[in-house]
Amino acid sequence: MPTSLTRRHGAIAAALLCLVLVAGLVGCAGPGTGAGEGSGAAGAANSGDTANSTNAAATGDSAPTGHVSAELPPTDPEVLVDDPQPKLPVTVDWDGAEVEVASVDRILTLDRAGALSRMVWALGLGDRLVGRDTATDFPGAADLPQVTPGGHTINAESILKLRPDVVLTDGSIGPSRVLDTLTDAGIPVVRIPDERTPDTIADFATQVATTVGLGEQGEKAGAAIVGKLDAATRDAQTRADGRRMMVLYLRGTTVAMIAGPESGASSLIERLGGVDAAEGLGMDGAFTPLTPEALVKAAPDTVIVMTHGLDSIGGPAGLGSLPGMAQTPAGANASVLDVPDSQLLSFGPDTPRVLAAMADALYGKAAA
């Protein structure tokens, strides 16, 4: 797989191509590279399967109804390392290519979710960030120069002007030739693995920490994040009502995809105490195009979306007009939860706070 695409965002790109080439095509497959592959099973339900498996829309008093939002006001990630003392140089080879990092005085992180910058901040090195990507939207980074003004693309000149000592990326921002140019210019470019779910946050913390010379401190930080996440999980599951949920990735009226297990959506829903409505669709990748048949078969009680994604289709009313949505309990009851784009599937140090905010929105705030 090209280094310019992570598994999750590679799956999105492949699904978008399918949608563009064949509108409404059932069973579009993702790139044939394993984990980034989107299963076509989500769109394979025939009319008989749909008729036999569709759940009647919940209409009782206990049915989740209405539009709710996760309350996540912008805030800096919690700093988990009080006195970071990087031990350098270090040599890392997360993607199979050895890279030596000799200095972390000037750090640049590049990823679509902003998870790398948040982890660097949590490790106590936020003051060493010299630029930011679009998703790095927390207050402490607001004054940093943005190197992705067009969204998710970079150019070598703007980065070279920042004189970074090291660039951390997961490959979700490119093009890859720009990263190659930076390497040719003598800048260490470290590609952090992109396999991130709520269950891999400790590994993610260790990978970033090791790269910046904070290996042991990073392990402790990762353990602290996991402890907070497990506590948020227990709280959410205590209040859960067992509803069926589905995470959708939406961009305008022409892009609608189901988030599968490798996007981290399944684990997130389980931690919320819900049932992943997409489980019965046979998905084994990160994302796959949404079809009316798959939506009706899944029969979610609540749909979870990114805030800007919901806005891009006209809000809850636009969501309700998606083909097949009205035939689901979520559509019949207009049950939707929106979460800030940079938080929903980023899976980093903020995930415990995100999970807690989602649980509060879904089930009501816990009694003090």
Give the role of each language-model region.
Residues P2-A115, E216-M246, G364-A368:
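Bacterial Sec-exported substrate-binding components of ABC uptake systems
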Residues P84, D105-L162, V166-G171, A277:
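A short, structured surface patch at a secondary-structure boundary
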Residues V101-D105, L116-V120, G126, A156, ...:
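Extracytoplasmic/secreted envelope proteins and their assembly/folding machinery
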Residues V147-N155, E195, G282-L290:
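Short helix-initiation/N-cap motifs at beta->coil->alpha
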Residues N155-T169, I187, T291-V305:
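Proline-aspartate-enriched helix->loop->beta-strand connector
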Residues P175-V178, V190-Q207, G242-S267, D311-G314:
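Extracytoplasmic ligand-binding site segments that recognize negatively charged/polar headgroups
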Residues T200, F204-V212, T302-A368:
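Structured C-terminal subdomain patch of bacterial secreted/periplasmic proteins
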Residues I258-F287:
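Alpha-helical, coiled-coil/dimerization segments enriched in small aliphatic residues
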